[in-house]
Amino acid sequence: MATDTASLVLGIETTCDETAAAVVERRSDGSGRILSNIVHSQIEDHAPFGGVVPEIAARAHVDLLDGIIARAMQQAGLGFKDLSGVAAAAGPGLIGGVIVGLTTGKAIALVHDTPLIAVNHLEAHALTPRLTDALQFPYCLFLASGGHTQIVAVLGVGNYVRLGTTVDDAMGEAFDKVAKMLGLPYPGGPQVERAAAAGDAARFAFPRPMLGRADANFSLSGLKTAVRNEASRLSPLEPQDVNDLCAGFQAAALESTADRLHVGLRIFRERFGAPHALVAAGGVAANQAIRGALQQVALAAGTQFMIPPPALCTDNGAMIAWAGAERLALGLTDSLEFAPRARWLLDANVITPAQFANTRAGF
């Protein structure tokens, strides 16, 4: 049963390499307030390996999560009995970490007789803009992270239609792989952005993948390969070579992304009418160059551009708590038997077009 009363929800996030917990208030008018938001990044643990090691991540979640939840509750000035619900990210993500967070959420819910909300990590990103702004449905979401690159029509809580997706590398994944091949430290995305700012984007004629296609899908694998080929040709690389390669790669990725979003917004209008906004979410949305490109896309499309603060674009507990609060307001709770999921489609009824059946577009 739906309720219009205010709620206090604890959110737990452990799907990748951030161990996070937060408490969020959802008021009866639908507005939100963050009471606490504690995030521990495991970057230093994974940096020697050049990427996230699932076993290390899961063990760190086990070691850290209880203390982080305690800090989140203390900062919010609440006890567990004050909570209206406990929201835990139940996927998609690295299954070891997902199990840690969801099991902890279940334990709290069971001991304190509090409703459990098993949150789709992607839905949490999709709904985060409504935590920080008075945003009404429907809106067009560009979700870009290390594991996902999607254009999604957000029609309501639990109601999502994917308009476009990557058929190979996610955008964050491509940025990280380019950084690694150029010898830049982990995490690679911010390093590529920093190097690109000092580079000449016009030095290399990199391809613009999928440009001009009628569908709104993405592909970055070929662009990544083009960067690798140029880097091999120039080896050994001088610092300016690295800067120029990063600038050329980022410019090509942004031009392709802008084109894909123009198409995605057109498809959105044809199917659902005008969106209330173009919204960006996910860790890649913290990139300032990407933010600028998206702002121009929204301007050209005649719609407003909205994006959460950078701290709410990357993985955090507040987004999980908020998604839980949004679902709780509609009376949507979950059984303690809910199973963790390594893969969990945001749009569960999607049918992958035949030409993309053997690509990552199906996930």
Swiss-Prot record:
Alphabetized, the UniProt keywords read: Acyltransferase, Cytoplasm, Iron, Metal-binding, Transferase, tRNA processing
Cofactor annotation remark? Binds 1 Fe(2+) ion per subunit.
**Required cofactors, per record?**
Fe(2+)
Q: Which InterPro entries match?
A: ATPase_NBD, Gcp-like_dom, KAE1/TsaD, Peptidase_M22_CS, TsaD
- Gene Ontology CC annotation, any one: cytoplasm
Similarity-based family: Belongs to the KAE1 / TsaD family.
Supply the HAMAP family for this chain. TsaD
Catalytic reaction(s) noted:
L-threonylcarbamoyladenylate + adenosine(37) in tRNA = N(6)-L-threonylcarbamoyladenosine(37) in tRNA + AMP + H(+)
Residues that, per the record, bind Fe cation: H121, H125, D315
The UniProt entry's GO biological process terms, in alphabetical order, are: tRNA threonylcarbamoyladenosine modification
Which PANTHER family did the record assign? TRNA N6-ADENOSINE THREONYLCARBAMOYLTRANSFERASE, TRNA N6-ADENOSINE THREONYLCARBAMOYLTRANSFERASE, MITOCHONDRIAL
Q: What is the name attached to this protein's record?
A: tRNA N6-adenosine threonylcarbamoyltransferase
Instruction: Kindly list the places in or outside the cell where this protein is found, as annotated in its UniProt entry.
Output: Cytoplasm
Thylakoid keyword on record: no
Chief place where the protein resides: cytoplasm
